[in-house]
Amino acid sequence: MQTRFTASAPHSAAVTAVAAAVLVTALPAAAQPVPAPQVAARAWMLTDVTSGQVLGGANMDERIEPASLTKLMTAYLVFEAVRDGKLKYDQMITPTETVRSVKTDESRMFLEPGKPVSVRDLTQGLIVQSGNDAALVLAEAVGGTETNFVMLMNREAERLGMKNTHFMNAAGLPDPNHYSTARDLSILTASLIKNFPQDYKFYSQKDFTYNNIKQPNRNRLLWLDPTVDGGKTGHTKSAGYCLVTSANRPLPDVPGASRRLLSVIIGTKSDAVRTQESLKVLN
C-alpha cells in the first residue's frame, strides 16, 4: 500500500502545494492525506526523491549522531574521485599501519597493513560490511590523510546544502562535533543516488567476502522488501540504531511509472526496531 503522510509544520505549506500537483496527475481523485504514523525513533523523515516532496517526518532538523551513516559521505567522495579519474576501482591500495587503530569492537572488513587491496574491494567493505578500516584507507587514498579528507567531507556537505552537519572523521566515530540531521542525511543520500546511479548499486549487494570472511549487509530490508535497492545502517551506543533506506516503488494507477522513496530512521532501540519502523514509514 502506498501512503502519503502529512508533513511536519515547518514545511506543510510547500509540501501541500507540491502534493496537490502530484495528486492530480498520479493518484486517484478521492485520495486524501492520512496522519503520519507514530514512529519509535528519535527522528525520522520520508521523502519522494522523484518529486522532491517531503512526505512526513519528526525532529527532522534535530542534531543527531550519524554513526556509520557518515559513510554515505565517505562513499560519495570515493564515487566522485572515481568519476573524476583520481581513483580507479581496479587500483590497488596498500593499507598503512594506521588500520591498526581500528578497534576490535568496531565494524571491520579485516584489512591487514601492507596487504594490497583494490579500491573496489575497499568500497564494498565500506558499504556492505560498514568497515571502519575501509573508511580510513579510502579517506587516505582520496585526501592523503584522514584530516584532509574530513575537510573535503565538510566542504561537500556545505555544497550539497547540508546546513546542520559537521564531520570529524570518515567512519562515524562519536565526537561532540560530529553531527548531522535526518534532513541532511536525506539530502546526501538523494544526491548520491542521483549523481552516481551506477555506483549506488553497491548498496544493493547482500554480502561481501574479504580475507575469507563473509559478512552480510546489515540492511535487513534488502531481504524483506523487493523494492528496496539500497541504504545504510548505523549504530553506536549513544546514537542508537539508525537506517537510511531507498525503495523504487510503482505508482498506483499509473502503468509503467514509479517513484523513489527515501526513509531516514534515527535512534531506535534495536536492529529489529529500525527495520520495523523503516517498513512502517515506507508503506
Predicted segments, located by residue:
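N-terminal secretory signal peptides that target proteins for export/translocation
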Residues: M1-A9
